[in-house]
């Protein structure tokens, strides 16, 4: 599969990107969810957390848990963050999951989201594909750039990309678990996520 693209709560910016990706037929070979009211698209049971019924997913909780198979069966995460405003960067468990899974990622989030990640010591994939969407302050134009990027990514040689980014992805994984290194920048969300990982609540 191409993308892993998970959407839970319906938000305007998520609906806009989802519709654009569907209109461009970019999700045809992807694993994705979208919780619309009339026709929710859910994960196949084999990709869901153990003990979870995809048709009765809890509205709250379970967001910090992670299961490995969806990341193994896809090459790139489209991270659908909580908001896309241009005045603050708000990171949630949605970005830490692909980092923990050593997955390549594209982020639909705030203006300068990737820049903030870099300030925290992480690396992104600007040497391998266009990340100029992060510099686009207008949310609608940012979506345009993400859609264009996703179309380009579907044509990439992913075996080469994963070989070339192995050290980068390992660096991000190590950085995520280096609490001392991140002590000045880390936010409450990743600390909570690490508590789940350390206590064995992260499913594999």
What are these regions (language model features)?
Residues 1-79, 85-92, 96-204:
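Pol beta-like nucleotidyltransferase catalytic core
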């Amino acid at each position: 599969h191409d993308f892993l693209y998970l959407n839970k709560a319906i938000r305007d910016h998520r609906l806009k990107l989802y519709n654009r990706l569907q209109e461009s037929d970019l999700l045809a070979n992807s694993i994705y969810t979208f919780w619309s009211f009339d026709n929710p698209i859910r994960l196949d049971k084999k990709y869901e957390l153990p003990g979870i019924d995809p048709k009765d997913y809890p509205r709250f909780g379970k967001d910090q848990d992670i299961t490995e198979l969806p990341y193994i069966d896809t090459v790139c995460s489209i991270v659908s963050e909580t908001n896309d405003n241009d005045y603050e960067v708000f990171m949630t468990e949605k970005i830490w999951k692909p980092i923990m899974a050593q997955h390549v990622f594209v982020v639909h989030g705030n203006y300068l989201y990737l820049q903030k990640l870099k300030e925290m010591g992480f690396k992104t994939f600007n040497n391998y594909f266009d990340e100029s969407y992060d510099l686009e302050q207008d949310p609608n134009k940012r979506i345009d750039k993400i859609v264009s990027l996703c179309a380009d990514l579907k044509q990439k040689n992913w075996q080469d990309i994963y070989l070339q980014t192995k050290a980068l992805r390992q660096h991000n994984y190590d950085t995520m678990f280096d609490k001392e290194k991140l002590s000045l920048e880390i936010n409450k969300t990743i600390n909570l996520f690490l508590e789940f990982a350390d206590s064995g609540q992260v499913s594999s």
